[in-house]
Each structure stands twice: as C-alpha cells, then as structure tokens.
A protein has these predicted regions:
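Cationic, glycine-rich low-complexity segments
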Residues: 42-43
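Extracellular, beta-strand-rich glycan-interacting domains
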Residues: 187-189
Length: 325
C-alpha cells in the first residue's frame, strides 16, 4: 500500500512539474491569443531601424537567458565591452563573446548565474528577472524604495518599472518565462522613460528622476515626435507639389527616407528622428477617423478647402482647419 501511495505521489509530482513547465513555456500564448501583432511587428521594426537589435522571433516565443543578456546590453549600448586579451570567462557552458557578455551582466546584477561556473544560457528568463535587469541597467536603484537596513526588496523593481512607465500596456506574468512580445514592449516603453540624474550640493549627492533625459535622447541622440503626413511622392494635401522620390513630409517638413510610405498621407503618425534624419514612422490613426476622397472626385481646392463629389453625386466641401497640420 505504501509503495502504491509513493508511486502515486511521484506520478502526481511529475505531472505537476511538467504541467507547470508546459504552462511556463506556452502560457504566454494565452496572453496573445487576441493581441494585436501589428504593434509587435511595428516595435520590432523600430528597434531594427534605430540599430539597437533585430528581434526576429514570433511574438509568443519565450526568451532565453542568453538572448535577454544580448538584447539588454545592446539596449544600453554596453555590448561593445570586450574581454581583456587572453581572458576566458568563468562560465563553462558559454564560449567566445557570449561568455564575457554574460559575465559582465552577472557582475552588474542584471541577471544571476546558476552557479559560479554555470550560466545555463538556453533556459528561459523569467518576467521578474527581465524587469529587474532592465531597471538595474537603466540606473534606477538610487531612487528606489529600500528597507530599513538599506537593501532593495525584490518587489521594488516592479514598483520602479510601474513608476517609470515601463509597464504601460504590459501584461505582468510574474514568475513565468517572458515572451518576446512582452519583452519588446518593455524595451519600447523604456526607450522614452525618464532616467536618473544627480546633483552635488553641500557635500551631498542627491539622486532624482530627470524629465526629458531618456535612453532615446541620451544614448541614441534621437527624438520621438507626433504629426500628420502631409505629402508623399504621389500626393501633397496642401497642393504644394509632389515630394521627391523616396521622400515624405510630416507636418509639411520634408524627410528623405528610403522606405515607401504611400498610404500615410493625411494620417496621424508617430515618428523617430535623429537630427534631420527620419529613422522610422508608423500610423496611429484610427479607422473611424478616415475620410477618404478619391482624387478623381476632387473638383477644386481653394483657401484650404476641398470641393469634391461624393458617392451620391452630391457636391461636398471639406476644409483643413487653420493650424491643422
């Protein structure tokens, strides 16, 4: 009888173990069963155009520890750190560049090792681990809540991420493996999160969150803007003439851009620029906001007002309000 009970207990424990791991590996699929993959694709393209990293993975794919370290160090531009000549990293299950990158990340506390000489690069990184790594890498610890003895509770990392806006639109999955869809959204939010600055006065250093100082501005010399596309290489809604090949106008400002954006004229967009260079642009227009007028139906344009014939053959007028760009 005892053997039967023992065998049943072992079977139950094994079942629970595999069930938990199956949920951990595939649980993210439930999160994204109704998700908008367009946003994920847009964010992946954004990071590629900014030259940060290329996350060529399905939205529901889970992130390994090695991939997380590589993406995080690229995000904060620490991936160019090289090991001294002849120095081999301590992890036996890694070699080459990945070995030193992992050792650097562990030394900074961005991720933990499993043992002194084992990193387990192919294991999944957990949501809480990823959040902690991002928060530490962005330098938030000086302004985080601490315990009475000065230590930082594990819960403070999630609290800081929430405070900084890194959790905006993110489904928090706690101790489960993080998916690419969730990780990319965390990185996207972290791009424009305000960073920590400090001032020295009276022999004392005070740390504070500095508005306007972000990863995007400080590390990539770029800026996120919003506007309306006023022209592409085919159409100019103000009648100022067509733009040049591979060109686009946003708020009537011309940008040379190698990609084709033929369907954005008149739409609200978010875009990223570095100096005068357009890095990436995408529509944030809602479908119900569209008024589509075929060019063949336009009868005239004067004083910022279009005269056109609608689908019922009636003459209509549509004005572009003053100050609307």
């Amino acid at each position: 009888m005892k053997n039967k009970i023992y065998a049943s207990t072992v079977f139950l424990l094994l079942f629970m173990f595999f069930a938990a791991n199956c949920f951990a590996a595939d649980g993210n699929m439930n999160i994204y069963s109704g998700a908008d993959e367009t946003e994920y694709t847009r964010n992946v393209n954004l990071f590629a155009h900014l030259g940060i990293f290329d996350a060529a993975a399905e939205i529901d794919s889970v992130v390994t520890r090695a991939d997380f370290v590589e993406m995080l160090l690229k995000f904060v531009r620490a991936d160019k750190i090289e090991a001294p000549d002849g120095v081999k990293g301590r992890f036996k299950d890694l070699d080459g560049e990945n070995d030193y990158m992992a050792e650097y990340a562990v030394s900074k506390g961005y991720i933990s090792a499993y043992s002194y000489d084992m990193f387990r690069p192919n294991d999944y990184v957990l949501f809480d681990e990823a959040v902690k790594g991002i928060v530490k890498a962005l330098g938030y610890e000086p302004v985080m809540n601490k315990s009475a003895n000065g230590d930082i509770p594990e819960t403070s990392y999630a609290e800081m991420a929430q405070r900084a806006g890194i959790f905006k639109g993110v489904v928090q999955t706690g101790g489960y493996p993080i998916s690419y869809g969730t990780l990319i959204k965390l990185f996207k939010n972290a791009l424009t999160a305000d960073l920590v600055d400090y001032k020295y006065y009276g022999g004392r250093i005070t740390y504070f969150i500095s508005g306007g100082s972000t990863v995007l501005s400080d590390l990539y010399n770029a800026e996120k803007k919003k506007g309306i596309v006023t022209a592409d290489k085919y159409t100019d809604i103000f009648g100022d003439g067509q733009t040049a090949e591979n060109g686009i106008k946003i708020d009537n400002v011309y940008y040379d851009f190698p990609q084709t954006y033929e369907n954005l004229v008149g739409q609200r967009v978010e875009y990223y620029v570095s100096g005068e260079k357009l890095m990436y642009v995408y529509s944030v227009q809602e479908d119900e906001d569209f008024l589509v007028i075929r060019s063949d139906d336009i009868d005239g344009f004067e004083n910022r007002t279009y005269e056109y014939t609608d689908e019922k053959s009636k003459k209509k007028h549509e004005s572009i309000p003053s100050g609307c760009t």
